[in-house]
C-alpha cells in the first residue's frame, strides 16, 4: 500500500493511461457527460476531500441525504488494508449518526480513533448514513473485491447489500470466527444497495448527476494522467 504522504508518482511505463480520445469517449458515451450541460462539482487532490465536500454541501442544504454514489476508481476506498474499519464498527457506530460526522471532535469522543483517509473515506460516508446506493466501477483488469467483507449484509459474500453492524457485546475482529453470532445479536445500520461494474461496456449513464468530484490522486496515478484534470477541451 502506497503511503498517503508519498510525493513520488508511480511509473508511466508500468501504469499506462488512456489517450485523450479514450477519456472523452468514456465521459461522453459511458457517463453521458457533455460540455454543453454543466454539472456542479470540484477537482480535489486526494480522495477523502470528497467527504468534506459532501459535508459542506449537506450543511448548506445543497445535497440531500441519503444519496447515490457512482465511484469510478481502481480502488473501492472501503477500508481494506486500513485499521479504521475496526474503529468504525466498534466505536463510531456506537454514537448517534449526527455525532459521527463531527470528525474534528473524535479526539474528545473516543480514546482511540481514525479520521477519514484516501482509502476508507467511503466507509466513513456509509457510517454517516449518507449513501443509499454505491456503484463501484472498478478497474476492468481487476474483479473489484478490494473491500472488507465484514461490511456486507450478514457478512455474506458476494452480496448486493452493504449493512454495517455494531455489536456492543462483541468486537469487530471476532466476526471472522463468530460470523453468525455477531450479526444475530448486532444493531444494524440501514441497508445500502451495492453494485460492482467490472467491464467498461457495463457503464451506461445519461449524465444525470447532481455533482461530480474529480480526484487527481497523485499517490496512485502517473504524471501522464494529469492532462485529464487540466484539459479545457
Regions found by a protein language model. Give the residues of each.
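Conserved alpha-helical scaffold segments that buttress catalytic/binding sites
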Residues: 1-233
Amino acid at each position: 500500500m502506497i503511503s498517503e504522504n508519498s510525493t513520488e508518482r508511480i511509473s508511466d511505463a508500468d501504469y499506462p493511461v488512456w489517450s485523450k480520445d479514450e477519456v472523452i469517449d468514456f465521459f461522453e458515451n459511458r457517463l453521458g457527460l457533455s460540455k454543453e450541460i454543466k454539472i456542479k462539482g470540484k477537482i480535489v487532490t486526494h480522495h477523502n476531500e470528497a467527504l468534506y465536500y459532501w459535508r459542506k454541501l449537506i450543511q448548506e442544504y445543497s445535497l440531500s441525504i441519503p444519496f447515490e454514489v457512482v465511484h469510478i476508481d481502481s480502488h473501492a476506498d472501503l477500508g481494506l488494508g486500513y485499521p479504521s474499519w475496526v474503529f468504525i464498527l466498534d466505536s463510531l457506530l456506537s454514537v448517534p449518526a449526527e455525532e459521527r460526522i463531527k470528525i474534528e471532535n473524535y479526539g474528545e469522543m473516543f480514546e482511540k480513533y481514525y479520521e477519514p483517509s484516501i482509502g476508507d473515506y467511503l466507509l466513513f460516508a456509509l457510517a454517516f448514513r449518507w449513501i443509499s446506493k454505491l456503484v463501484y466501477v472498478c478497474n476492468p483488469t481487476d474483479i473489484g473485491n478490494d473491500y472488507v467483507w465484514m461490511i456486507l449484509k450478514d457478512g455474506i459474500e458476494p452480496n448486493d447489500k452493504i449493512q454495517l453492524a455494531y455489536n456492543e457485546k462483541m468486537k469487530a475482529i471476532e466476526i471472522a470466527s463468530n460470523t453468525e453470532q455477531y450479526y444475530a445479536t448486532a444493531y444494524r445500520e440501514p441497508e445500502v444497495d451495492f453494485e460492482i461494474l467490472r467491464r467498461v461496456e457495463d457503464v451506461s449513464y445519461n449524465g444525470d448527476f447532481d455533482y461530480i468530484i474529480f480526484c487527481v490522486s497523485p499517490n496512485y496515478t502517473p504524471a501522464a494522467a494529469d492532462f485529464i484534470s487540466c484539459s479545457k477541451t
